[in-house]
């Protein structure tokens, strides 16, 4: 005996409108104007100064899986003086915030590499803000968002990220 059972997936707290919202896709990124597409092909693998760093990215943050409009952050893989006497940092990732970069380090690195990466991230924070800090609180997991079964709306999650970024400089100043 066959039953005609509809294919229904129920997610508590998720509305149809939230499911139907259009999100920017990889195809959308490829269909941008040539200048913007060219910029995305050439995201730098090396950081030297904030003034020479890119101001936007059309890719999602590696940690929170959201598109963002802030200046992209990254996990520094090394720091050295280059042949021109400039400080140079290796670049890994595309992050919307220092907190998301810190989360990535905490999840993907083990000691002693985790400690080294966190110290380099603190140095990068200084380059961007001119403030010495001792700790960057990691971002919450993307799984806290409703679309992943969590309790936070996308707006509440983003608000939490902004609060974390604002708290870095006010609570963790290096003395």
UniProtKB/Swiss-Prot annotation:
Q: A single Pfam family, by name? A: zf-FCS
Q: What induces it?
A: Expressed in the late phase of the viral replicative cycle.
Q: Name one GO molecular function term.
A: zinc ion binding
What top-level branch of life does the organism fall under? Viruses
Family to which this protein belongs: Belongs to the asfivirus B175L family.
Q: What is this protein called?
A: Uncharacterized protein B175L
Q: What organism does this protein naturally occur in? A: African swine fever virus (strain Badajoz 1971 Vero-adapted) (Ba71V)
């Amino acid at each position: 005996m066959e039953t005609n059972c509809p294919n229904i997936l129920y997610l508590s707290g998720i509305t149809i409108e939230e499911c139907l919202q259009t999100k920017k896709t990889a195809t959308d990124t490829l269909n941008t104007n040539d200048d913007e597409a060219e910029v995305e092909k050439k995201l730098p693998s090396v950081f030297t100064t904030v003034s020479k760093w890119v101001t936007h990215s059309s890719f999602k943050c590696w940690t929170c899986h959201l598109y963002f409009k802030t200046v992209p952050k990254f996990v520094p893989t090394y720091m050295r003086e280059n042949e021109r006497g400039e400080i140079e940092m290796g670049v890994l990732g595309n992050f919307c915030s220092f907190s998301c970069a810190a989360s990535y380090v905490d999840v993907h690195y083990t000691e002693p590499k985790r400690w080294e990466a966190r110290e380099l991230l603190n140095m990068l924070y200084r380059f961007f803000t001119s403030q010495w800090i001792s700790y960057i609180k990691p971002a919450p997991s993307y799984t806290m968002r409703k679309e992943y079964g969590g309790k936070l709306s996308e707006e509440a999650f983003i608000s939490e990220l902004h609060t974390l970024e604002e708290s870095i400089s006010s609570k963790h100043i290096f003395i």
